[in-house]
C-alpha cells in the first residue's frame, strides 16, 4: 500500500463529498439525503450488537446460579467464558482480513438464534432436571465465543466504515447513543428476568433474545452492505447511487474493469467522476 496514494485518495474523497454537499457541520446533516441511510446502518449495527443476546453472557455468573450451579461452579464457568471470548477476539483479527463484514455479522446473529432457541427449549422441557444446568452453561460459553468472534469486534469496524468521511465523528457519536439506550433497556430488563423475586423466568429469557436476534438478522440481511475492500470513495459512490445492499460487493470488480484503481494520482484527479461511470 502506497501511503501517498492513500492520503491522496482521502483528500479526493473529501473533495467529492464537498461537491455533493454532504455537510459536516450539524447533526441534522446525518438525516439528509443519502446520509440518512448511512446513519440508519451505523445505528442499527450497534443496536443489533446490544440485542444479540450477549447481555446473557454479561450476567453469566448470576445466570449460572439461577440455572442451578453453586457459587464456585458459576465463577469457574464465567472465567471459562471470558477465556473463550479472548480466543474468539484473537481469531477475529484473521477473519476480518479474509471474510466479509456482512458474512460475519449475519453469522454472528444466526448462531445466537439457534443457540438461544436451544437454551429456551432446554429450560422449558428439562426445567431443573440434572443436566439442564450444564447444557445452559455450555450454551452461554458458546455464545461468548461466537460473539467475540463475529458481531462483537465487527460492529466497531462497520460503524467506522459506513459513514461519510465528513460526518464520521457525528455518526459514530449518534450510533453510540442508540447503543447506550439499548443497553439501558437490557440492564433494566435482564435482572428482572433472572431474579427469583421478580419475573423469575430463568433460562426462558433465551426466547426473548432469540427473538430480538432474529429480528436483527432479518434487518441485516436486507439492509447491511458489504464494506470489505471498499474505499470511502467507493462507498460514497454506492450510497450516492442508492445501490441495493446486494450490489456493494460488485463495485470493486467494476472499478477494476475500468482501470480506475490502476490510474496514477494525477490521472485520477483529472478524471474525478471516473469512478461514478464505473457504476452506471
Predicted segments with their positions:
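Alpha-helical transmembrane bundle of multi-pass membrane proteins
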Residues: 8-280
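Short intracellular "coupling" helices and adjacent cytoplasmic loop segments at the cytosolic face
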Residues: 1-6
Amino acid at each position: 500500500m502506497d501511503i501517498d496514494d492513500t492520503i491522496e485518495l482521502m483528500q479526493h474523497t473529501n473533495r467529492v463529498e464537498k461537491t455533493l454537499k454532504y455537510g459536516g457541520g450539524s447533526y441534522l446533516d446525518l438525516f439528509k439525503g443519502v446520509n440518512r441511510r448511512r446513519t440508519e446502518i451505523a445505528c442499527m449495527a450497534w443496536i443489533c450488537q446490544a440485542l444479540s443476546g450477549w447481555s446473557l453472557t454479561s450476567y453469566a455468573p448470576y445466570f449460572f446460579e439461577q440455572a442451578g450451579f453453586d457459587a464456585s461452579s458459576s465463577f469457574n464457568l464465567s472465567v471459562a467464558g471470558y477465556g473463550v471470548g479472548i480466543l474468539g477476539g484473537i481469531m477475529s483479527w484473521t477473519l476480518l482480513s479474509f471474510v466479509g463484514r456482512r458474512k460475519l455479522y449475519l453469522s454472528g446473529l444466526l448462531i445466537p438464534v439457534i443457540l438461544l432457541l436451544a437454551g429456551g427449549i432446554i429450560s422449558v422441557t428439562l426445567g431443573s432436571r440434572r443436566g439442564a444446568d450444564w447444557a445452559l452453561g455450555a450454551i452461554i460459553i458458546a455464545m461468548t465465543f461466537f460473539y467475540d468472534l463475529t458481531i462483537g469486534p465487527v460492529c466497531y469496524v462497520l460503524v467506522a466504515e459506513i459513514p461519510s468521511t465528513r460526518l464520521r465523528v457525528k455518526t459514530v457519536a449518534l450510533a453510540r447513543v442508540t447503543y447506550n439506550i439499548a443497553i439501558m433497556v437490557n440492564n433494566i430488563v435482564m435482572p428482572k428476568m433472572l431474579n427469583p423475586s421478580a419475573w423469575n423466568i430463568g433460562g426462558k429469557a433465551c426466547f426473548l433474545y432469540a427473538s430480538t436476534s432474529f429480528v436483527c438478522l432479518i434487518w441485516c440481511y436486507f439492509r447491511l452492505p458489504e464494506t470489505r475492500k471498499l474505499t470511502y470513495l467507493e462507498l460514497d459512490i454506492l450510497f450516492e447511487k442508492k445501490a441495493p445492499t446486494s450490489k456493494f460487493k460488485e463495485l470493486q470488480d467494476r472499478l477494476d474493469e475500468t482501470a480506475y484503481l490502476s490510474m496514477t494520482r494525477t490521472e485520477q484527479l483529472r478524471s474525478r467522476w471516473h469512478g461514478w461511470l464505473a457504476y452506471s
